[in-house]
Amino acid sequence: MGVNKNNVKIHVEHLKKNFGKLEVLKDVSTDIYEGEVVVILGPSGSGKSTFLRCLNRLEEITGGEVVVDGHDLTDKKTDLNKVRENVGMVFQHFNLFNNLNVMGNMMLAPVELKKASKAEAKERALHLLDRVGLAEKAEAYPAQLSGGQKQRVAIARALAMNPDIMLFDEPTSALDPEMVGEVLQVMKQLAADGMTMVVVTHEMGFAREVG
């Protein structure tokens, strides 16, 4: 599947973000199309993660416009929770719930937010765990998983909401080098399947592989 230039999934215009007097993002404008994989590179402290977090308004926006799937995130009338249901996010440190097993982590959002039945949510969770090569870990707890396995579960958990867009914030930087490949493989398959992806990283080789 290729990039659909007729469908802008994310439109950013003159985006500004300040932390107090510190200007982190200055007049950023871009369009991200359906099926496109955009890799954001740069050294630590250059505003990569801040930009990513503005795309689902986990960071408040100082100025400019961010439109996701036709919804203006700077408009007070926009239901941010509804928009976020269609934007999956994978964090550097996995952010799994340690008190829930893998299946519990996978089923929580679809059941609570999308009102899926437990049977539906379980079926989809098992399908996604199989897709990321972790079907046998459904009953395991996060403490029993390696870093690479945790990140693959985190990706599968985000996919459980059936998002149109996936945001990745430094998805491999907390992993041991030998575990990077297994996460990269899942992301490459997502890209091949036509998922719209925005990936923040400082690893050039990783960026070349995914982008």
Language model feature labels by segment:
Residues 5-211:
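ABC family nucleotide-binding domain
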